[in-house]
Amino acid sequence: MLTVEEIKALIPHRYPFLLVDKVIELEAGKRAVGIKNVTINEEFFNGHFPHYAVMPGVLIVEALAQVSGVAIAKAQEGTNKVGLFAAIDGCKFKRPVRPGDQLRLETEITRVKGPIAKATGTAYVDGEVAAQAEMTFAFKDV
């Protein structure tokens, strides 16, 4: 398991844009499972939507990308490379994510070729699919 501090050592995201609270499973370069506890205190709920708070779908996908980034970064430790979110395909939103929900973010790295990696991700709430997407990352020297 990785704590938020260990996650911050692997990916560059910080508050308010770090969307992963912990990683509970990790196989470097292969797969990761992360958790995001969604609370009413999230800044985005002020405007999305004031009378029916729903987590923006794009932020659910960003959370999946961050978990994928942890798996990629763990395999790249010791290098000056970071995996940047480059593309998204086949994205589907199946249910709203609301304050009080816990997102289980499951990702798998499906291909790494040269400076490009591909991953699939599924976000669950209480075992029910909330969102799924295919993601592409480009490695960049930093």
From Swiss-Prot:
Record's keyword terms, sorted: Cytoplasm, Lipid A biosynthesis, Lipid biosynthesis, Lipid metabolism, Lyase
Enzyme class: lyase
A molecular-function term among this protein's GO annotations: (3R)-hydroxyacyl-[acyl-carrier-protein] dehydratase activity
CDD domains for this protein: FabZ (cd01288)
One GO-annotated biological process of the protein: fatty acid biosynthetic process
Catalytic activity: a (3R)-hydroxyacyl-[ACP] = a (2E)-enoyl-[ACP] + H2O
InterPro entries: FabA_FabZ, FabZ, HotDog_dom_sf
Entries under PANTHER family matching the protein: 3-HYDROXYACYL-[ACYL-CARRIER-PROTEIN] DEHYDRATASE (PTHR30272:SF1)
Family: Belongs to the thioester dehydratase family. FabZ subfamily.
Protein name: 3-hydroxyacyl-[acyl-carrier-protein] dehydratase FabZ
Organism expressing this protein natively: Shouchella clausii (strain KSM-K16)
